[in-house]
């Protein structure tokens, strides 16, 4: 398959630059993977689509304020975007400046903090914090929310809350698992009251999620790697859910990738998983765990639209996107959502 197969023209005004006033006020496009049938709904209608005994799996990563501003010793300005935290003092990061900082040079951050440029790894820089504080403490003090490039505005105070799920727990992501942004506490409680089981995995979304695919042939793409954790209690719930003939519903592509990574690492019987994953899901992939998914509308030619196409069928998904454009759905991180059921292979 060609990467350009996943292209579509999106009018600029359909890119959501701000979230809805209420989290669950978004629209929801449902797609039946088997038939391609579409239905226009409200996000709150999801309550009627998830059945008692179904298992919903959420990604509880917490977005860190991963964008830092500062200057080199020469006075040249630079911008740092954390890709991942290596430990309490060291980060792997993208650095934007007129000239790349040299190894062992000192970077002066806003707020008076200093970092040393420790090493370079291809396009990424390893930076070490020179302070008694931890990286997380410095990010919380002077970091900015790493809004995706297409939101195309400076971050605001409201983004600290709204570019974050209500159930976030484990700091480490530099992009939000956006399907989860639509859920508020009341909706989660309503799902539980209905008899729906709720479980949490962690995948720290990296900035690589916004990198364009730079090859023509889908098969040649090298996926970025991210840290994920699927604990044993979630594995047990999945096994029970499947045994009862109920569905595993993944909230977001990151939850899908976490669960399918666990399946890929297990031979035969599903096991807990913790570690880096570079799983790349594109049409032809056989899903082992996920039966339905909730996801936002993704960028053209992105690995995320490829994943959804693998799940519900390429033709069905591309037709759904054209429908969404015609019906003026809001796209990307702060936009509307889809509820998609799996196409039988």
Swiss-Prot record:
Its main location: cytoplasm. The keyword Amino-acid biosynthesis does not apply. GO terms for molecular function: S-adenosylmethionine:tRNA ribosyltransferase-isomerase activity. Its EC number is 2.4.99.17. The keyword Transferase applies. It catalyses: 7-aminomethyl-7-carbaguanosine(34) in tRNA + S-adenosyl-L-methionine = epoxyqueuosine(34) in tRNA + adenine + L-methionine + 2 H(+). Gene3D superfamilies: QueA-like (3.40.1780.10). Pathway: tRNA modification; tRNA-queuosine biosynthesis. Keywords: Cytoplasm, Queuosine biosynthesis, S-adenosyl-L-methionine, Transferase. It holds the Pfam family Queuosine_synth. One of its GO terms (biological process) is queuosine biosynthetic process. It is found in: Cytoplasm. It comes from the Bacteria. One of its GO terms (cellular component) is cytoplasm. PANTHER family: S-ADENOSYLMETHIONINE:TRNA RIBOSYLTRANSFERASE-ISOMERASE. Belongs to the QueA family. Monomer. Transfers and isomerizes the ribose moiety from AdoMet to the 7-aminomethyl group of 7-deazaguanine (preQ1-tRNA) to give epoxyqueuosine (oQ-tRNA). This is S-adenosylmethionine:tRNA ribosyltransferase-isomerase. It comes from Shewanella sp. (strain MR-7). The lineage of its organism: Bacteria, Pseudomonadati, Pseudomonadota, Gammaproteobacteria, Alteromonadales.
């Amino acid at each position: 398959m060609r990467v350009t197969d996943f292209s579509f023209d999106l009018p600029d005004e359909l890119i959501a630059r701000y979230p809805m006033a209420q989290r669950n006020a978004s629209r929801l496009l449902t797609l039946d993977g088997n038939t391609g049938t579409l239905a226009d709904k409200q996000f709150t209608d999801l309550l009627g689509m998830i059945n008692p005994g179904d298992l919903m799996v959420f990604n509880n990563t917490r977005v860190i304020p991963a964008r830092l501003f500062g200057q080199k010793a020469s006075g040249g300005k630079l911008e740092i975007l954390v890709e991942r935290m290596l430990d309490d003092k060291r980060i792997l990061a993208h650095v934007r400046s007129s000239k790349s900082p040299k190894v062992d040079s000192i970077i002066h951050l806003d707020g008076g903090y200093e970092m040393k440029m420790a090493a370079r790894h291809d396009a990424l820089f390893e930076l070490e914090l020179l302070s008694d504080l931890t990286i997380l403490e410095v990010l919380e003090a002077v970091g900015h929310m790493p809004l995706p490039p297409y939101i195309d505005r400076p971050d605001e105070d409201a983004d600290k809350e709204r570019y974050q799920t209500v159930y976030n727990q484990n700091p480490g992501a530099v992009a939000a698992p956006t399907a989860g942004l639509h859920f508020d506490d009341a909706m989660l409680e309503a799902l539980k009251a209905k008899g729906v089981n709720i479980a949490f995995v962690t995948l720290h979304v990296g900035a690589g999620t916004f990198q364009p695919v730079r090859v023509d042939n889908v098969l040649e793409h090298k996926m970025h790697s991210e840290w994920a954790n699927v604990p044993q209690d979630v594995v047990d719930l999945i096994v029970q859910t499947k045994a009862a003939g109920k569905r595993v519903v993944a909230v977001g592509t990151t939850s899908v990738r976490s669960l399918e990574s666990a399946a890929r690492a297990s031979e035969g019987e599903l096991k807990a998983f913790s570690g880096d994953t570079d799983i790349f899901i594109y049409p032809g992939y056989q899903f082992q765990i996920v039966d339905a998914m909730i996801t936002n509308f993704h960028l053209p030619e992105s690995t995320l639209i490829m994943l959804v196409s693998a799940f519900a069928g390429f033709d069905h998904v591309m037709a759904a996107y054209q429908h969404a454009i015609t019906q003026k759905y809001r796209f990307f991180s702060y936009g509307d959502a889809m509820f998609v059921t799996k196409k039988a292979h």
